[in-house]
Amino acid sequence: VKPISPETIVDIGCGPAAETTRLESYSQQYLGIDISREMLAQAQTLNPHLSWLQGHWTSLPLANESVDWVFANLSLQWVDDLNTAFAEVYRVLKPGGIATVNTLLPGTFSSLQNSWAEVDNKPHINNFSTLADITQATETFPWLHKTFYTHDYVQHFSNLRALLTSIKGVGASLVKRDNNSGLMTKSKFQTLENTYETYRISGGLPLEWHIVNIVLVKRG
C-alpha cells in the first residue's frame, strides 16, 4: 500500500538504507531517520545525495504536517511508548497523508525463545506488543482510515548459525544479548543448538514470524 505520488516520504528506522532505493523511486523527497549514528553513516555513504536525520519514533525531528507518507519496516517493535509514537506520526503527516507500518507480534521466534529457556532464565527475545495494545495506541486521533492485517509465516534454515545470522540481517539484532557474559559462550551455543534441533522438521530449523501490517490515513 502506498499513496499516489507522494512528495515527501519519511522512513523511520531506516537502518543502512535497506528500503531506500525502492522508496526514493516513489517520491520527490526521501528522508531517512534512525536512532543509530552508525546506521545513518552507512546509509549516507551509500546514498550521499539523500537526507538523513538522527531521531526516534517518539520524538521525530520533523515539522508539523510536513510528510505525505510515513513508512516503517520492522522498527516499531523497539518502541515502549506506542501512544507517543503514533501521536508523532499523526503530528507530522499532512492532511490526507498515509502511514504504512509493520511490526512483530508475540509468538515471533517462539522456537528460539523456547530453546533459550533451556539454556538460562535470562531474556533473549524482545517482548513484542500485542495487537490489542497496538490498535489501542492508534485510537487517540480521528484517523480517516485504519487497517490492521496480520501475516504469519515460517522460514527454515539448515543450521542455527544461519538462522541467527538472518535475524541480525533485519538491521539490528532482534535477539537481546546476555548482559552479564556479553557474547554467547561455546557451551551456551551448544546447548541452544541441541535444544533447537528438537524443533527440526523436514524443511529445516523453523523461525516463526508473526507480523501486523498497519495502514493509517489522516483526514484531509
Annotate the PLM regions.
Residues 147-220:
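Conserved Class I S-adenosyl-L-methionine
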Residues 58-70:
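A short acidic, Gly/Pro-enriched loop at the edge of an enzyme's catalytic core
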Residues 8-59:
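Class I SAM-dependent methyltransferase SAM/SAH-binding core
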Residues 69-81:
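A short SAM/SAH-binding and catalytic strip from SAM-dependent methyltransferases
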Residues 94-160, 170-181:
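Conserved catalytic/acceptor-binding region of the Class I
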Residues 83-95:
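A short glycine-rich, Lys/Arg-flanked "PGG" loop and its adjoining helix->strand segment in the class I
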Residues 1-7:
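Conserved alpha-helix/loop element of class I SAM-dependent methyltransferases that forms part
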